[in-house]
Amino acid sequence: MKGMCLMDVNMLLKQLTVEERAALVAGTDFWYTNPVPRLGIPALSVSDGPHGLRKQLGEADNGIATSEPATAFPTAAATASGWNPENLRHIGEAIARECRHYGVHVLLGPGVNIKRNPLCGRNFEYFSEDPYLSSEMAIAEIEGVQSQGVGVSVKHYALNNSENFRFMGNSVASEKTMRAIYLKVFERIVKQARPATLMCAYNRINGVYCAENKWLLTDVLRKEWGFDGLVMTDWGAVKNRVTGLQAGLDLEMPGDTAICRKQIIDGIADGTLAMEELDKAVRNVLNLIDRTYQETDSTPVDFDAHHALAAEIAADCAVLMKNDGALPLKPSDRLHICGEMFEHMRYQGAGSSMINPARLTTPKDAFEARGTANGRSRRTCAPSNGRTSSRRIRRCPPPIQASCWA
């Protein structure tokens, strides 16, 4: 994987001021790194998300505002059920084409945290409770994305397996447990896929924040596994910028806070932070720019083809848990369908993984298309009560009130 920037990193390092160095190791806002115009160093664009591009429109919003149209591929939880890494390779290639079209250089994904607890609110973004399956799927997706010149950010490094107290939680585990399960997925990815970046997590590990954990970021990641990419923070994970740099953290996201920049400049001035420690991070930022920067691809995206790919993979990943003779359907069958999700389906989560789908096919659309093709007639009636989020399970409306197919 090689970008189009072709910078002389060693020459640039000699010309950068301390202030410019401090700026380069932090984002200028939620989605861009800081450029240095006088030296021709461009800004990189980063964007969510793990199973489809979420190129946000407008101001920072914590994953709520409108985003550019993109393809909503099946989530990691779904694709892992297909046990087919090639599906992920095709997804990665397609997402990367959309990234290039929208001028995105680094995709913030895939998410590979191990599913320790089924109640974790972001489990749908992750592949599996098994480090081998998770890494095999992720490796294929990463290779697909990076084959198109777009970088990835594998997240969340590490032991980030719960959303409770997400900014300060403490994951307590023995080194044996970490290496056998929670770090193994990252180790296989780093060694086999050479991801452009890793995103360190909010949580602490045995009392030490990931963004300040030298054992995690340097001893294991770089010295043992040979990682040569960049480490960025999850958004707002920095507690102490100088300690983070000394531990092996390169890029602070999302913003270029005056406090953190001052910590770096003051640290260099008073000797708390060595210039060599800062330059390691600066070099990694410059290498990432050199590796992933390319001009926006004006070629139109074939969203119809990507939507068809998503549908094909979704079908391949579907798992039939039980069948009491209802399937396969026969042309003569009369179908009784009830529930709000027949027309307003839930196909993704919220936040940083929420995609504005360029194409959307609901179950209703699919049944209408199939019904027309098979000559079936349709009768419509009142929708269900819509309380799909209620804790109470309500009875399905009688047939006369539901959508029916004959």
Task: Show the residue positions of the predicted features.
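Glycoside hydrolase catalytic-domain context in secreted enzymes
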Residues: 1-406
